[in-house]
């Protein structure tokens, strides 16, 4: 078999390449994007692999999220979208994945002309669908229960909700790196005039996103005197914090969580002044099925290592397309 997902979460493509986890047998490692579940074992890969491949934006994000010295522990090569690298008798090309800044799909073509594709994490709308013979794909929302059937424009709803919250004072927005910068850009583009306040790490990630073309507006560090006064006085401003900080900051304030795990409603109030907005950076079930339909693979492997519905998605793919499909690694029980 020309692709596999190992028990440690490495996505093997062809003879030489492992994506998103360490694999001692493969000389090449790819990091598809800078989220923790796709950077597993990276220190080991840097020590032992001939090359670790990623986009320039992903490298810049890892420099901020880990440290600029971290990637110096090995040989890192950045690869632009659409550029091909040859290793032995295989060719590796990155294509854009609409997920977070720098996210990539990976195509490996072997000497027999077989096209082996790993989607990485993606949203279908702005992700190019690659023709594949063997397709390895994410399965985060791989169940038919994970469909976003609402028609409303979630971005517009999010902007309206934040503007409503600003009438009461400070609005705290919680999300993950990449998603936070996406919502900053949405608010900036919509002309929301309130100051943006961020802690140091979110600030540094945001500056990388701006360097790569995102437009986020002026950001104020939360430790600055002016920002402290805004937050302490519950003045109208928007404070952006990583989801991990939700129990530490903004208690009692107007709070908005951006999350993909919402399918019934685009916006839900679950406590007084606390809302969840369904802004996802993953395809829902219909988006995953659509990728398979357009890619026309002979074999699909779903990622059964990371969080999701890999086995359910396999059943649906077999039923709808009559093609071979496997959830890997196999888990029993």
Model-derived regions, located:
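His/Asp/Glu-rich metal-coordinating catalytic cores
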Residues: 2-25, 30, 36-174, 178, ...
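Short, well-ordered alpha-helical microsegments
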Residues: 39, 103, 125-127, 180-184, ...
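A short acidic, amphipathic alpha-helical/loop segment
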Residues: 41-45, 65-66, 182-187, 290-291, ...
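Structural motif
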Residues: 28, 51, 115-116, 134-135, ...
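Active-site regions of enzymes building and remodeling cell-envelope glycoconjugates
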Residues: 26-34, 45-54, 68-79, 89-92, ...
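A short, well-structured beta->alpha microelement
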Residues: 2-21, 77, 121-124, 211-248
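Binuclear metal-ion centers of metallo-dependent hydrolases, dominated by the metallo-beta-lactamase
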Residues: 82, 131, 143-222, 226-230, ...
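C-terminal regulatory/interaction regions
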Residues: 6, 221-333
